[in-house]
Swiss-Prot record:
Domain of life: Bacteria
Signal peptide: none
Name used for this protein in its record: UPF0227 protein YcfP
Similarity section: Belongs to the UPF0227 family.
Organism taxonomic ancestry: Bacteria, Pseudomonadati, Pseudomonadota, Gammaproteobacteria, Enterobacterales
NCBIfam families: PRK04940.1
Pfam families on file: UPF0227
């Protein structure tokens, strides 16, 4: 089972395309939708939905995957639910760059302070990070610097922020999922 979390643009047709691409790894791909506008509510909702899926799951190596803001959530929810994560261009600093787009961007900073202390150290090697060198929305170098000490970083030379085509990375994702 692969759980897919969309980014801020929840209505993007690219979400469906990514789900279809992920089905080459596992036919059971589940998209979990969330508001993107209310961080504390989103966290509760995502934890509840992912936990529900894991309770009914027969796959002993589930994976959670997210793009952009979905990558922010996939890393955290995956850690809290003890499943491996794959994140594409994760938005690591939504409290800085979501101003004017969501109701309370400061809630992201609050979530960070209330999260498990040093969670990335405890999550070491359980997240695969795929970053675009041509991310027009986020500073991918800053993301790499924050995540490199804990996770493997894969650089993509073609894609933009929304990562429309993930197919060049499917074999690596499949191998990462298999490690369970």
């Amino acid at each position: 089972m692969i759980i897919y979390l969309h980014g801020f643009d929840s209505n993007s047709p690219g979400n469906h395309e990514k789900v279809l691409q992920l089905q080459f790894i596992d036919p059971d791909v589940r998209l979990v939708s969330y508001s993107t506008r209310h961080p504390k509510h989103d966290m509760q909702h995502l934890l509840k939905e992912v936990d529900k899926m894991l309770q009914l799951n027969v796959d002993d190596r589930p994976l959670i995957c997210g793009v952009g803001l979905g990558g922010y959530w996939a890393e955290r929810i995956g850690f809290l639910c003890d499943i491996r994560q794959v994140v594409f261009n994760p938005n690591l600093f939504p409290y800085e760059n979501m101003e004017g787009k969501i109701d309370r961007p400061e809630e992201y900073a609050d979530i960070a302070t209330k999260c498990v202390t040093n969670f990335r150290e405890k999550n070491r090697d359980r997240c695969l990070v795929i970053l675009s060198r041509h991310d027009e929305a986020l500073d991918s170098q800053r993301s790499a610097e924050a995540l490199h000490p804990y996770y493997e970083i894969v650089w993509d030379e073609e894609q933009t922020h929304k990562f429309k085509n993930i197919s060049p990375h499917l074999q690596r994702i499949k191998a990462f999922k298999t490690l369970g």
